[in-house]
């Protein structure tokens, strides 16, 4: 009888102990792209924005250049210099408090040297609270055309000011520099211990290096250098665009996954999107756009065995740069919150996937896809993030 009583008491104690244990909250890596053009200490920005405040010039002069235009957005924090560590300290706190734990820095290299890098090197890396935020690089290796300079952005021309294509020697220079300067930072984002590096324009990458075979050889070299630096490997991502990744007939190969065959041959490990505008018509209602995005995630999941990390964009309207632009309608904070929930559910439904979600963006003001507070929705988008990834279990 005593033994039975002891067993019963033990079971009761176990049940009470189990009941008192808090439910472990799922952990997500919510990564917001950060566009580094809002800096005041980079002289290479002045040819595009001569006033010396970076692309804030485009934001603040919109009505002056186009009186009565519907686009009249204003930053609640003002036209801050994001290359100032004091400014970045406040932005890191705001981002982290609202559920963002990774910044993906748009990173540029033109004419043999970095471009728009001071937001990262002078701002983020010198911020006293940088340990609250991880970061990684998305190499924005697209060509630079007229679009940044509003004095010429509406002209019917396609002038390539700088090309994003680079050869093998330049690629090696970039990789070695990034390994030493960024990958070795304690805050650099890693998956399974491997530094993550994303390439935006796969076509430019291939063409600059001389072809698919040469690009693959360059990636193998890059991986060796990363391992020599003490890491277990490299997590190389590519930016997914539309459904067609054909390059010089490569997709005609005899395989049931031709697009994956291309990116695997080069050596990529995973992908995400940068913007809904890259694969969905933008002149539409936001909920319908999100439906199409989720359908695209499912298509990618079917067509690729490589991991895909779901992406949510806040909106799209490029009119500050080009005056007339397709624009997303009804992209309210409430609808954005619903989109975030779908991304979270998609990650939950793929338990083998690293829980990474990318968001466009922290500060793409001139594309009207930003989390930072403004005169229209205030802190609405940030509060939506907080409800989904901080407040809820």
Feature-to-residue mapping (PLM):
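Positively charged n-region of N-terminal signal peptides that target proteins for export
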Residues: 1-4
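Bacterial N-terminal signal peptides
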Residues: 6-15
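Sec/Tat signal peptide C-region and signal peptidase I cleavage site
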Residues: 16-20
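Glycan-processing catalytic domains of CAZymes
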Residues: 21-393
